[in-house]
């Protein structure tokens, strides 16, 4: 979380780029949510996307329900196979791997304003359980207030990054301690995980929009894109899987 211009979207882009450089669409898939319609939509057309970048609140709710259904399906597959997690399952089945799935929300505040209970429930359920089956969450917001980053949500998202924020209160909302209000902006961040006693100050990398576009254009020129429309449709809440 962080204020406008602090480096939040650049950080998301560097994470996405790093994952794209290291994983084919067979190994890793994305669901991306961008209510502002300007940050993540440039990734439309890459083969790693399960569905076009979602800009609609109701479609986001459907996608969260689909993803929790996918999580349950994966747990059933692992149980039937006797595997503890996705890593051990994929080692046993090198020719039939389950891809990891990263669900990215670039502006949580817009979703919480329209569908708070459904969005919060979906995020919490995935944050609590989904990592073992290879489903991961990246959630970002410019407004780190307690009605956006709720206590339950925060309790279930142990790895947090705070960019420059306006006040000590905002810093405490993200990290449970002050400090983010003193950051300098432009990728200056505090990073905290569950096994750290206090946040670590880190300088984020920078990637330009031109560099992102170059990678996206290259990926678009390769594999054919296959989208699953059921992910964002009502009723697509766990009845089918792409994998």
Task: Label the predicted regions.
Residues 3-5, 141:
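The conserved Walker
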Residues 8:
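Conserved lysine of the Walker
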């Amino acid at each position: 979380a962080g204020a406008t211009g602090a480096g939040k979207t650049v950080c998301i882009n560097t994470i996405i780029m790093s994952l794209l450089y290291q994983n084919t669409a067979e190994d890793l898939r994305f669901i991306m949510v961008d209510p502002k319609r300007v940050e993540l939509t440039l990734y439309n057309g890459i083969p790693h996307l399960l569905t076009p970048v979602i800009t609609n609140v109701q479609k986001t709710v459907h996608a969260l329900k689909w993803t929790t259904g996918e999580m349950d399906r994966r747990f059933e597959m692992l149980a039937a196979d006797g595997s503890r997690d996705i890593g051990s399952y994929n080692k046993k089945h090198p020719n039939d791997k389950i891809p990891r799935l990263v669900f990215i929300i670039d502006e949580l505040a817009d979703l919480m304003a329209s569908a708070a209970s459904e969005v919060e429930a979906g995020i919490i359920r995935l944050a609590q359980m989904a990592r073992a089956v290879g489903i991961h969450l990246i959630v970002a917001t410019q407004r780190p207030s307690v009605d956006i980053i709720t206590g339950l949500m925060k309790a279930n998202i142990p790895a947090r990054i705070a960019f420059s924020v306006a006040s000590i209160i905002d810093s405490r909302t993200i990290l449970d301690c002050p400090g983010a209000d003193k950051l300098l902006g432009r990728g200056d961040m505090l990073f905290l995980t569950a096994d750290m006693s206090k946040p670590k100050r880190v300088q984020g990398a920078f990637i330009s929009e031109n560099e992102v576009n170059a990678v996206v254009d290259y990926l678009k020129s390769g594999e054919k894109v296959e989208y699953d429309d059921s992910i964002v449709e009502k009723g697509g809440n766990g009845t089918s899987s792409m994998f």
